[in-house]
Regions:
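Elongated, amphipathic alpha-helices that form coiled-coils and helical stalk/scaffold elements used
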Residues: 61-221
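Domain-core and long-helix interface of multi-subunit machines
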Residues: 1-65, 117
Length: 221
Protein backbone atom coordinates (compact mmCIF):
# COMPACT_ATOMS: atom_id res chain seq x y z
CA UNK A 1 0.00 0.00 0.00
CA UNK A 2 2.82 2.37 0.85
CA UNK A 3 4.48 1.67 -2.51
CA UNK A 4 1.20 2.27 -4.35
CA UNK A 5 0.68 5.55 -2.52
CA UNK A 6 4.26 6.57 -3.27
CA UNK A 7 3.84 5.68 -6.95
CA UNK A 8 0.62 7.70 -7.14
CA UNK A 9 2.32 10.65 -5.46
CA UNK A 10 5.21 10.49 -7.94
CA UNK A 11 2.83 10.29 -10.90
CA UNK A 12 0.80 13.25 -9.61
CA UNK A 13 3.99 15.24 -9.10
CA UNK A 14 5.23 14.44 -12.60
CA UNK A 15 1.90 15.36 -14.16
CA UNK A 16 1.89 18.62 -12.25
CA UNK A 17 5.48 19.33 -13.29
CA UNK A 18 4.95 18.48 -16.94
CA UNK A 19 1.64 20.29 -17.36
CA UNK A 20 2.07 23.93 -18.35
CA UNK A 21 -0.75 26.42 -18.04
CA UNK A 22 -1.31 29.66 -19.88
CA UNK A 23 -2.57 32.83 -18.19
CA UNK A 24 -4.42 35.97 -19.20
CA UNK A 25 -1.09 37.70 -19.69
CA UNK A 26 0.96 34.90 -21.26
CA UNK A 27 0.02 32.28 -23.86
CA UNK A 28 2.46 29.78 -25.33
CA UNK A 29 3.15 27.69 -28.40
CA UNK A 30 4.39 24.13 -28.00
CA UNK A 31 6.37 22.59 -30.86
CA UNK A 32 8.07 19.24 -31.35
CA UNK A 33 6.39 15.83 -31.14
CA UNK A 34 2.75 15.87 -32.28
CA UNK A 35 3.29 19.18 -34.12
CA UNK A 36 2.42 22.69 -33.06
CA UNK A 37 -0.09 23.40 -30.31
CA UNK A 38 -1.19 26.93 -29.47
CA UNK A 39 -2.39 27.38 -25.89
CA UNK A 40 -4.25 30.60 -25.14
CA UNK A 41 -6.46 29.41 -22.30
CA UNK A 42 -5.91 26.16 -20.46
CA UNK A 43 -2.71 24.17 -20.68
CA UNK A 44 -0.78 21.33 -22.27
CA UNK A 45 1.78 18.71 -21.35
CA UNK A 46 5.33 19.74 -22.16
CA UNK A 47 7.80 16.87 -22.21
CA UNK A 48 11.50 17.64 -21.80
CA UNK A 49 13.73 17.19 -24.86
CA UNK A 50 10.89 16.35 -27.27
CA UNK A 51 8.94 19.59 -26.80
CA UNK A 52 9.88 23.27 -27.02
CA UNK A 53 7.70 26.16 -25.91
CA UNK A 54 7.68 29.83 -26.87
CA UNK A 55 5.85 32.18 -24.55
CA UNK A 56 3.82 35.01 -26.07
CA UNK A 57 2.90 38.11 -24.08
CA UNK A 58 -0.75 39.11 -24.36
CA UNK A 59 -0.58 42.48 -22.63
CA UNK A 60 -1.42 45.70 -24.44
CA UNK A 61 1.65 47.76 -25.29
CA UNK A 62 1.33 51.55 -25.25
CA UNK A 63 3.80 53.49 -27.35
CA UNK A 64 4.04 57.28 -27.54
CA UNK A 65 5.64 58.73 -30.66
CA UNK A 66 6.65 62.38 -30.58
CA UNK A 67 7.78 64.11 -33.76
CA UNK A 68 9.16 67.61 -33.24
CA UNK A 69 11.98 69.90 -34.34
CA UNK A 70 14.01 68.44 -37.20
CA UNK A 71 12.09 65.17 -36.72
CA UNK A 72 8.70 66.83 -37.27
CA UNK A 73 6.45 65.63 -40.08
CA UNK A 74 6.57 67.27 -43.51
CA UNK A 75 3.05 67.83 -44.82
CA UNK A 76 1.69 68.00 -48.36
CA UNK A 77 1.97 71.80 -48.39
CA UNK A 78 5.61 71.58 -47.20
CA UNK A 79 4.78 72.74 -43.70
CA UNK A 80 6.20 70.98 -40.66
CA UNK A 81 3.87 69.45 -38.08
CA UNK A 82 4.83 68.64 -34.50
CA UNK A 83 2.79 65.69 -33.37
CA UNK A 84 2.38 63.50 -30.29
CA UNK A 85 0.55 60.24 -30.95
CA UNK A 86 -0.20 57.21 -28.80
CA UNK A 87 -0.43 53.71 -30.24
CA UNK A 88 -1.89 50.71 -28.41
CA UNK A 89 -1.03 47.29 -29.79
CA UNK A 90 -1.16 43.67 -28.65
CA UNK A 91 -1.26 40.08 -29.84
CA UNK A 92 -4.97 39.21 -30.28
CA UNK A 93 -6.24 36.09 -28.45
CA UNK A 94 -6.36 34.21 -31.73
CA UNK A 95 -4.46 30.99 -32.47
CA UNK A 96 -3.12 32.18 -35.81
CA UNK A 97 -1.95 35.50 -34.35
CA UNK A 98 -0.29 33.83 -31.35
CA UNK A 99 1.43 31.29 -33.61
CA UNK A 100 2.69 34.06 -35.91
CA UNK A 101 3.93 36.16 -32.98
CA UNK A 102 5.80 33.16 -31.58
CA UNK A 103 7.53 32.60 -34.92
CA UNK A 104 8.38 36.21 -35.77
CA UNK A 105 8.86 37.85 -32.37
CA UNK A 106 9.54 34.97 -30.01
CA UNK A 107 10.00 35.98 -26.38
CA UNK A 108 10.31 39.67 -27.32
CA UNK A 109 6.56 39.93 -26.79
CA UNK A 110 7.32 39.59 -23.07
CA UNK A 111 9.65 42.60 -23.06
CA UNK A 112 7.94 45.96 -23.72
CA UNK A 113 11.22 47.69 -24.61
CA UNK A 114 12.19 45.09 -27.21
CA UNK A 115 8.67 45.18 -28.62
CA UNK A 116 8.83 48.97 -28.93
CA UNK A 117 12.01 48.62 -30.98
CA UNK A 118 10.12 46.34 -33.38
CA UNK A 119 7.11 48.59 -34.00
CA UNK A 120 8.07 52.21 -33.40
CA UNK A 121 9.80 52.63 -36.77
CA UNK A 122 6.77 51.26 -38.60
CA UNK A 123 4.41 53.55 -36.69
CA UNK A 124 6.61 56.59 -37.38
CA UNK A 125 6.65 55.70 -41.09
CA UNK A 126 2.84 55.50 -41.10
CA UNK A 127 2.61 58.99 -39.59
CA UNK A 128 5.01 60.37 -42.20
CA UNK A 129 3.21 58.71 -45.10
CA UNK A 130 -0.21 60.07 -44.15
CA UNK A 131 1.12 63.55 -43.32
CA UNK A 132 2.75 63.74 -46.76
CA UNK A 133 -0.69 63.41 -48.36
CA UNK A 134 -2.47 66.04 -46.25
CA UNK A 135 -1.86 69.74 -45.68
CA UNK A 136 -1.33 71.02 -42.15
CA UNK A 137 -4.80 72.58 -42.18
CA UNK A 138 -6.34 69.32 -43.42
CA UNK A 139 -4.73 67.38 -40.59
CA UNK A 140 -6.02 69.90 -38.06
CA UNK A 141 -9.54 69.98 -39.50
CA UNK A 142 -9.77 66.22 -40.15
CA UNK A 143 -8.01 64.63 -37.20
CA UNK A 144 -10.30 61.63 -37.26
CA UNK A 145 -9.49 60.90 -40.90
CA UNK A 146 -5.77 61.34 -40.25
CA UNK A 147 -5.88 58.87 -37.35
CA UNK A 148 -7.97 56.45 -39.43
CA UNK A 149 -5.42 56.45 -42.27
CA UNK A 150 -2.49 56.09 -39.88
CA UNK A 151 -4.22 53.18 -38.14
CA UNK A 152 -4.81 51.38 -41.43
CA UNK A 153 -1.22 51.70 -42.63
CA UNK A 154 0.35 50.97 -39.24
CA UNK A 155 -1.85 47.91 -38.66
CA UNK A 156 -0.92 46.50 -42.07
CA UNK A 157 2.78 47.09 -41.39
CA UNK A 158 2.77 44.93 -38.24
CA UNK A 159 0.23 42.32 -39.37
CA UNK A 160 2.94 39.84 -40.38
CA UNK A 161 4.27 39.84 -36.79
CA UNK A 162 1.01 38.66 -35.23
CA UNK A 163 0.45 42.03 -33.57
CA UNK A 164 -2.65 44.16 -34.14
CA UNK A 165 -3.44 47.78 -33.35
CA UNK A 166 -6.17 48.38 -30.80
CA UNK A 167 -6.35 52.17 -30.98
CA UNK A 168 -4.41 55.23 -32.12
CA UNK A 169 -4.85 58.62 -30.44
CA UNK A 170 -3.57 62.02 -31.51
CA UNK A 171 -2.59 63.82 -28.31
CA UNK A 172 -1.36 67.10 -29.74
CA UNK A 173 -0.73 68.84 -33.06
CA UNK A 174 1.05 72.11 -33.76
CA UNK A 175 3.06 73.83 -36.45
CA UNK A 176 6.82 73.58 -36.01
CA UNK A 177 8.37 76.97 -35.08
CA UNK A 178 9.79 78.75 -38.11
CA UNK A 179 13.26 78.76 -36.51
CA UNK A 180 13.34 74.97 -36.89
CA UNK A 181 13.05 75.14 -40.69
CA UNK A 182 16.31 74.47 -42.52
CA UNK A 183 16.75 76.82 -45.52
CA UNK A 184 19.18 74.34 -47.09
CA UNK A 185 16.47 71.68 -47.17
CA UNK A 186 14.34 71.73 -50.34
CA UNK A 187 11.08 71.00 -48.53
CA UNK A 188 11.84 73.44 -45.71
CA UNK A 189 12.78 76.21 -48.13
CA UNK A 190 9.41 75.83 -49.87
CA UNK A 191 7.66 75.89 -46.52
CA UNK A 192 9.65 78.94 -45.42
CA UNK A 193 8.64 80.80 -48.58
CA UNK A 194 4.97 80.08 -47.90
CA UNK A 195 5.24 81.02 -44.23
CA UNK A 196 7.05 84.26 -45.04
CA UNK A 197 4.41 85.19 -47.62
CA UNK A 198 1.62 84.40 -45.14
CA UNK A 199 3.27 86.42 -42.37
CA UNK A 200 3.82 89.41 -44.65
CA UNK A 201 0.24 89.19 -45.93
CA UNK A 202 -1.09 89.20 -42.36
CA UNK A 203 1.13 92.15 -41.44
CA UNK A 204 -0.13 94.09 -44.45
CA UNK A 205 -3.73 93.24 -43.58
CA UNK A 206 -3.26 94.38 -39.96
CA UNK A 207 -1.56 97.55 -41.14
CA UNK A 208 -4.36 98.27 -43.62
CA UNK A 209 -6.97 97.78 -40.89
CA UNK A 210 -5.02 100.07 -38.55
CA UNK A 211 -4.70 102.76 -41.20
CA UNK A 212 -8.37 102.50 -42.19
CA UNK A 213 -9.40 102.79 -38.55
CA UNK A 214 -7.13 105.81 -38.06
CA UNK A 215 -8.53 107.55 -41.14
CA UNK A 216 -12.09 106.77 -40.06
CA UNK A 217 -11.49 108.32 -36.63
CA UNK A 218 -9.86 111.42 -38.14
CA UNK A 219 -12.80 111.90 -40.54
CA UNK A 220 -15.26 111.69 -37.66
CA UNK A 221 -13.33 114.34 -35.76
Amino acid sequence: IILIALAIAIIVYLLHWLYRRSSKEVSFVRTGMFGEKVVISGGAFVLPIIHNITQVGMRTLSLTIKRSGDKSLITKDRMRAELVTEFYTKVPPDKKAVSTAAQTLGNRTLDPEHLREVVQGRFADALGEVAANMTLDEIQENRGQFVKEVTKIADESIGHTGLALETVSMISLDQTPIEQFNPANTFDSQGLTQLTEQIEARKKKRNDITQDTKISIENKN
